Amino acid sequence: MIQGTTSDAGKSTLVAGLCRLARRAGARVAPFKPQNMALNSAVTADGGEIGRAQALQALAAGVAPHTDFNPVLLKPTSDRGAQVIIHGKARMNLDARAYHDYKPVAFDAVLESYARLRAGYDTVLVEGAGSPAEINLREGDIANMGFAERVDCPVVLVADIDRGGVFAHLVGTLACLSDSERARVRGFVINRFRGDIKLLEPGLDWLRAQTGKPVFGVLPYLHGLLLDAEDMLPSQARSAAARGDAGVLRVVVPALPRISNHTDFDPLRAHPQVEFTYWKSGPVPDADLLILPGSKSVQRDLAWLRDAGWDAVIRRHLRYGGKVIGICGGMQMLGRTLDDPLGLEGAPASVPGLGLLDFDTTLQPDKTLKNVTGHLALPGAAAVHGYEIHMGDTRGPALAAPALTLAAGDASGGVRPDGAVSADGQILATYVHGLFDAPDACAVLLAWAGLDGAERIDYPALREASLERLADSFAEHLDLRALYAEFR
């Protein structure tokens, strides 16, 4: 089991790289995260929902994503509450205290999934959540040492040296553990190191002497990895490279407080002709394309946008010929009304949308979870592959001009419409995540948004190359013989 001294220490990436190394060695390996709290999620082959990081780890391992890889997923709906997803299906919304009482039920689901994976795979690589040293969360823990102790799993502790204080993080974490938990930690991995390793060696010697535990490796800081983030937004901006006469498209996405599935924009951030910005505050930069992203709490995030003046920003942008895309929750915001009669994303309410497309959305208790294929309803009809994760039922005249046609996914072999394109062709709305992943679709959408000579980039191939680069680095910098000796 890989645990970390902090959130974003490198647990997900370490598991992904080890999954790829195991695949290279011919082992059948399964990634596993008992409990994940994230708004980036993926649809599995068995029709459920798991954290995006586990889907990436499955790709690294060469296996189809399955709900057993992440049996408990918590999707925050507010600062104190979350939607609880068990074995891929939404069960209920709970506040923190109510979920604490529910944990025994969640732990049963965790143990069921783990037992199935142990029976079906050569190795299970487990990822912890946050830090095992959260004293206030120790009672009833199912994500870190509580799980490791229950199933007798050895632990490797990873820390991010780029944050500073790496030795305090490692030794301090051990100090916060019980004797049995401390003994379970077999050693350490130090992540994101830059500089001369010889200057670090005295610290490594001290760490070994202080703890009696080995350092399995020091991993270098790898720039430019294109890997799906578990939850944290990437750095604020990504500027296009200077390209002489080649065009550049300016894309701005509001960093909504409850933004979901922002991995939709990874292909744009990787595109050499796109100047990409996540906006949080202050004046909105000039843009050719504004994208309203998905949200786990659409009404609250729409109110946040309004408070920031984005309704006026969008209308001015359209008045001067700019383009707008709304994805999932962003699509719902573009309509006339947003109704949540059951309080699925907060208190029951009905609020006006931005009124830019003639449709209305009502949230329903049954969540749509589908992997989809289809074509853009734009010149060229480029192929699209993606997924739907939403609870919205959207209806209205604007849907008569769909943005995509999707395979119906049933025995009929037919197609179904999705989303809408405005009569003036400036607004495109869809429920489909992963809109920019397919190379041809990305190029067509960038051309629609105004980019002359849009290059075709193959983002899935770039992500695959990043996994290979990650595994190569691990093979060079980890003591794999010592690490594999801890596998059971």
Swiss-Prot record:
GO molecular-function terms, A-Z: ABC-type vitamin B12 transporter activity; catalytic activity
Residues in coiled coil: none
Domain GATase cobBQ-type: 248-441
Transmembrane recorded as keyword: no
GO biological process: cobalamin biosynthetic process
Record: active site: 328 (nucleophile), 433
Pathway recorded for this protein: Cofactor biosynthesis; adenosylcobalamin biosynthesis
Keyword annotations from UniProtKB, A to Z: Cobalamin biosynthesis, Glutamine amidotransferase
CDD domains: CobQ_N, GATase1_CobQ
PROSITE patterns: GATASE_COBBQ
One Pfam family this sequence matches: GATase_3
Position of the signal peptide: none
Functional summary from the UniProt entry: Catalyzes amidations at positions B, D, E, and G on adenosylcobyrinic A,C-diamide. NH(2) groups are provided by glutamine, and one molecule of ATP is hydrogenolyzed for each amidation.
Family classification: Belongs to the CobB/CobQ family. CobQ subfamily.
HAMAP family: CobQ (MF_00028)
Protein name, as recorded: Cobyric acid synthase
Species assigned in the record: Burkholderia ambifaria (strain ATCC BAA-244 / DSM 16087 / CCUG 44356 / LMG 19182 / AMMD) (Burkholderia cepacia (strain AMMD))
Name of the gene: cobQ
